[in-house]
């Protein structure tokens, strides 16, 4: 059945709606971005931060992202607001600042103004009235008055600490009282407090992340509908980004990964340029932002044709089983590291069934050979960042391990692999007070993957020759052409379990869409 469509303006902000015309003359519209009347809960977030700071007085200062240009250029990069500032303000435009007086609970947003000539070139920025109507702040004031305000506040409240995020983001206070020199400036505690506040999402934040997931899931669905007609990884990326854009999502949460065949075995592959023909799998790891809040979704599909090869189907089913087992464990108090161990244990059991691994299961677990195929952490927090604050804590890392982060996935250290191996052998759940325990209001990813990266597998096994003794090389050779399989959903931890925020099709549902059995296919533009 044919369906006509047209783009129409639905409000004064020029939001676009996809108008669907059906043969009977009826129509339906899906606004790409409706005008929200709900204020951003800046005050709620500020109070959470103050609570985590554990103080009853003090002045918090945060600086928004200033206008910048590329190095040796007069061209501006796409604007991306500083996330710590956005969390406490909701202001998504450059050159703004905020102050929060803990004692009086006063949250002020300091905003710039543009002269008519600047507006001619750059357009207008939100006015005081705009900000007051959309953001839950006590007042919006002209930024030119800010330094005078802060200096006066510190002068008249000599016992007050000024909390800063970074030393290079301090307000320029020429008349800062001498007695403050190095003694009442706190640089360090604010970041920890904001991190602690951000890790548990407010209802507003959950709605934003859910919306980002809805848009991204529809974009993944659009790719599934068209994948048999696409020729390159670039085509896949283009379809996904376009589908997000027409639904009102202006930015991607991270650079999309569209890797086919061997490229699917590169965790952070972003070239997205190779042909799809002749490849067994396509890993599409892509998610949009909605008002600065991220989604993070991965789906694996046949790169060409209507179905997986037998080998790719086998690996897909294993990863699917890994993910289902892990998601079923999500609830408050559960150790995330234990969930990671569960994923690896499922992989070992399934590898033994297909003959990829041979030997005693306990010895295989202790050898950590499964990390040759599943080398990364199971997931991370999602929020204002794709890899949101405190994600390293999910796998028991401390700040000294920050260098182990590589993009969206954590490189498992030897120590962490040993801890996971111990959990696999003992099947022992850590206590609810563990630093990696889940809590209500967290949004995390569950993203197991299996990869056949020849160079990595050979190097991993050569480091400890015993590992290679557990791998059946002839079986392994059959699976190298698969490349890789990863499945990733965003999971909200609820009071008694979880809610899967991701609705992107996977498994048999995805294959039905690829094969044209999607009953909704004629009612969507992209």
Swiss-Prot record:
Catalyzes the removal of a penultimate prolyl residue from the N-termini of peptides. It catalyses: Release of any N-terminal amino acid, including proline, that is linked to proline, even from a dipeptide or tripeptide. Binds 2 manganese ions per subunit. One of its GO terms (molecular function) is manganese ion binding. It comes from the Eukaryota. This is Probable Xaa-Pro aminopeptidase MGG_05684. Belongs to the peptidase M24B family.
């Amino acid at each position: 059945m044919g369906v006509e469509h047209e783009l129409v303006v639905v409000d004064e902000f020029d939001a676009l709606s996809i108008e669907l015309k059906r043969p009977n003359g009826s129509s339906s519209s899906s606004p790409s971005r409706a005008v929200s009347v709900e204020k951003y809960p800046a005050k709620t977030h500020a109070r959470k931060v103050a609570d985590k700071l554990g103080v009853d007085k003090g002045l918090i200062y945060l600086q928004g992202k200033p206008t910048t240009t590329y190095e040796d250029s007069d061209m501006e990069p796409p604007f991306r607001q500083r996330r710590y500032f956005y969390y406490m303000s909701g202001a998504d435009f450059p050159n703004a600042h905020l102050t929060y007086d803990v004692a009086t609970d006063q949250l002020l947003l300091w905003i710039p103004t543009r002269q008519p000539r600047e507006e001619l070139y750059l357009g207008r920025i939100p006015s005081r009235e705009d900000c007051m109507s959309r953001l839950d702040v006590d007042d919006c004031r002209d930024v030119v008055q800010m330094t005078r305000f802060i200096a006066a506040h510190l002068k008249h409240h000599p016992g007050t600490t000024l909390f800063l995020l970074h030393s290079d983001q301090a307000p320029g206070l020429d008349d800062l009282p001498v007695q403050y020199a190095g003694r009442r400036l706190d640089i360090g505690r604010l970041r920890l407090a904001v991190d602690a506040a951000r890790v548990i999402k407010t209802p507003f934040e959950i709605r934003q992340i859910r919306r980002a997931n809805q848009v991204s899931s529809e974009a993944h669905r659009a790719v599934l509908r068209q994948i048999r007609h696409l020729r390159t990884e670039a085509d896949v990326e283009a379809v996904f980004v376009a589908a997000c854009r027409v639904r009102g999502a202006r930015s991607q949460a991270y650079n999309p990964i569209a890797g086919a065949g061997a490229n699917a075995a590169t965790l952070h592959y972003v070239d997205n340029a190779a042909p799809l023909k002749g490849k067994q799998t396509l890993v599409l790891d892509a998610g949009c932002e909605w008002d600065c809040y991220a989604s993070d979704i991965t789906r694996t599909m046949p790169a060409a044709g209507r179905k997986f090869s037998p080998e790719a189907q086998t690996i897909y089913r294993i990863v699917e089983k890994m993910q289902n087992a892990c998601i079923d464990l999500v609830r408050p108090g559960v150790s995330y590291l234990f969930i990671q161990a569960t994923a690896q244990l499922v992989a070992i059991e399934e590898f033994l069934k297909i003959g990829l691994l041979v030997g005693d299961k306990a010895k295989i677990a202790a050898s950590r050979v499964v990390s040759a195929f599943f080398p990364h952490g199971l997931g991370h927090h999602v929020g204002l960042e794709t890899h949101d604050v405190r994600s390293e804590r999910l796998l028991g890392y401390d700040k000294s391990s920050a260098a182990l982060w590589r993009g969206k996935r954590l490189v498992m250290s030897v120590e962490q692999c040993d801890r996971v191996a111990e959990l696999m052998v003992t099947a022992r759940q850590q206590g609810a007070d563990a630093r990696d325990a889940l809590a209500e209001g967290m949004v995390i990813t569950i993203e197991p993957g299996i990869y056949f990266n020849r160079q990595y597998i050979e190097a991993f096994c050569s480091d400890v020759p015993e590992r290679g003794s557990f791998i059946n090389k002839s079986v392994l050779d059959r699976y190298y052409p698969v490349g890789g399989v990863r499945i990733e959903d965003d999971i909200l931890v609820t009071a008694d379990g979880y809610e899967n925020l991701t609705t992107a099709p996977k498994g048999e549902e995805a294959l039905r869409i690829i094969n044209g059995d999607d009953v909704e296919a004629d009612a969507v533009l992209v």
